[in-house]
């Protein structure tokens, strides 16, 4: 894990050959949906493991079958809330949660419009109650313009959790700048920080639309405007 000196609290995993090889597979246009999903799970699992190293641990006495000794315990690891942004982040969350078995999970449906305004639409939020002991991890594969994450962070800023983290696959400097400008205390962990955004707001060289590549290109449902909350 490498701390990026351009920002406070921004880290990448460019020093991991395993993750760089996985990212290489994700970037390839020839990678099929199932392989793409599995790659996101692998990245989430590895990055989740690395996140545990940033948490507070305390010593505790334990009894083995032979004698008393000392172990460690992390209260932080037991107070994790993973917020997943539909739909691309599901495989990433699947990997993350393997390191945080007790984690609560929140779901946010948010989508970004096209250039030039990149308007964010958020039409579904279901997130557990948050408190000052929680470590909140927002999983979103791509930090492009940062507008989606800023909208999501604004929804939960008043809950004042212990830590707010963003975990992603790729980020553009423009997106990190935007998020940090509004939420300087938010920590960002990504596999790699790419070069820039193109005129359409996509990360380049990037890996394309993570949601489409993980689950397939969406069907254009003509009845969608008439659909209501299914709960």
Swiss-Prot record:
Cofactor: Mg(2+)
Magnesium is among the record's keywords: yes
Residues reported in the UniProt entry to bind 5-phospho-alpha-D-ribose 1-diphosphate: 87, 112, 140-148, 209
Domain of life of the organism encoding this protein: Archaea
Function: Catalyzes the conversion of uracil and 5-phospho-alpha-D-ribose 1-diphosphate (PRPP) to UMP and diphosphate.
Cofactor, how bound (note): Binds 1 Mg(2+) ion per subunit. The magnesium is bound as Mg-PRPP.
Ligand binding (GTP): 38-42
InterPro entries (UniProt xref): PRibTrfase_dom, PRTase-like, Upp_A, Ura_phspho_trans
Family annotation (NCBIfam families): PRK00129.1, upp
Activity regulation statement: Allosterically activated by GTP.
Pfam families: UPRTase
Any one of the GO BP annotations: UMP salvage
Alphabetical UniProt keywords: Allosteric enzyme, Glycosyltransferase, GTP-binding, Magnesium, Nucleotide-binding, Transferase
Family as reported in the entry's similarity comment: Belongs to the UPRTase family.
Reactions catalysed according to its record: UMP + diphosphate = 5-phospho-alpha-D-ribose 1-diphosphate + uracil
Protein name (record): Uracil phosphoribosyltransferase
The EC number(s) this enzyme carries: 2.4.2.9
Species whose genome carries this gene: Methanococcus maripaludis (strain C7 / ATCC BAA-1331)
Pathway per the UniProt entry: Pyrimidine metabolism; UMP biosynthesis via salvage pathway; UMP from uracil: step 1/1
Species lineage: Archaea, Methanobacteriati, Methanobacteriota, Methanomada group, Methanococci
HAMAP family associated with the record: Upp_A
The keyword DNA repair belongs to this UniProt entry's keyword annotation: no
């Amino acid at each position: 894990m490498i701390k990026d000196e351009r920002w406070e609290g921004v880290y990448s995993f460019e020093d991991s050959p395993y993750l760089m090889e996985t990212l290489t597979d994700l970037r390839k246009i020839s990678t099929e949906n199932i392989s793409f999903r599995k790659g996101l799970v692998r990245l989430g699992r590895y990055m989740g493991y690395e996140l545990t190293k940033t948490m507070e641990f305390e010593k505790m006495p334990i009894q083995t079958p032979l004698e008393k000794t000392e172990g460690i315990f992390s209260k932080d690891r037991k107070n994790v809330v993973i917020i997943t942004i539909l739909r691309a982040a599901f495989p990433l969350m699947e990997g993350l949660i393997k390191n945080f078995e007790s984690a609560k999970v929140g779901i946010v449906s948010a989508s970004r419009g096209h250039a030039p305004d990149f308007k964010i639409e958020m039409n579904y939020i279901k997130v557990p109650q948050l408190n000052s002991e929680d470590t909140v991890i927002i999983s979103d594969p791509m930090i492009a313009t940062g507008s989606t994450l800023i909208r999501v962070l604004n929804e939960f800023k008043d809950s004042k959790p212990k830590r707010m983290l963003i975990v992603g696959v790729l980020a553009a400097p423009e997106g990190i700048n935007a998020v940090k400008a509004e939420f300087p205390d938010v920590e960002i962990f990504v596999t790699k920080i790419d070069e820039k955004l193109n005129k359409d707001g996509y990360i380049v060289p990037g890996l394309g639309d993570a949601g489409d590549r993980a689950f397939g290109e969406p069907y254009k449902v003509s009845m969608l405007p008439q659909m209501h909350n299914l709960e």
